[in-house]
Amino acid sequence: MLYGKMNLGLLVSAAIFSAACSGGSKKTAMGTYAYDRAFFAERGIETLELTSEDGASRVLVIPAYQGRVMTSSAAGDTGDSYGWINYKFIEKGELNPQFNPVGGEERFWIGPEGGPNSFYFKKGDEQVYANWKVPAAIDTDTYDIRSQSGSSVCFTREFALRSASDRVFRIGVERTIELVDRDGAEQTLGAEIPGDVKFVAYRTNNVITNRGDESWTRDSGMPS
């Protein structure tokens, strides 16, 4: 059995030095973390949050979007929302048979996207955009929660993908998202974060496992 690992490491928001909004009147203003959380709640889309002890660092995750990090904040509910969200597409409430670009900040993806071992084209189809289709396993499937705490969550999912060479790959995914505290962020960055700087940081670890009977090789193809 072969295990494939993808460690995306630490993400510290590029807006680490941005000033946070304040005041009750700003709580649900567009562009804030609270606004985006409410946007999903109003549409019946389940979310879960990873939150620091002081409530300032927040990460919003959606199981139905493959355990995707949709957005984050360095200053709680009233802070800037750092993720890009495709409001218009989500508001339509319709699935696109080719690809559903809901947006987000960090997600699980799988390759190859092109070539004889691509998971995005059928055997015999010309590999052009019109024939490109994202597998449901990384587009519309809900990932299961294996474990969860206030600062981390672990998702799992098993599925089968058929390549452009008509070979079936049975894949298990374990995806962990973990909020990183100040000490952890400083260790990763190799630098001290000033006490007056608001920040949010998290790391993800994605492990793919061969659940089939045949080995994955360079010649026969393998997920990337």
Where are these regions (language model features)?
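Surface-exposed acidic/polar loop and edge beta-strand patches at domain peripheries
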Residues: 22-203, 207, 211-224
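Bacterial N-terminal signal peptides
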Residues: 9-18
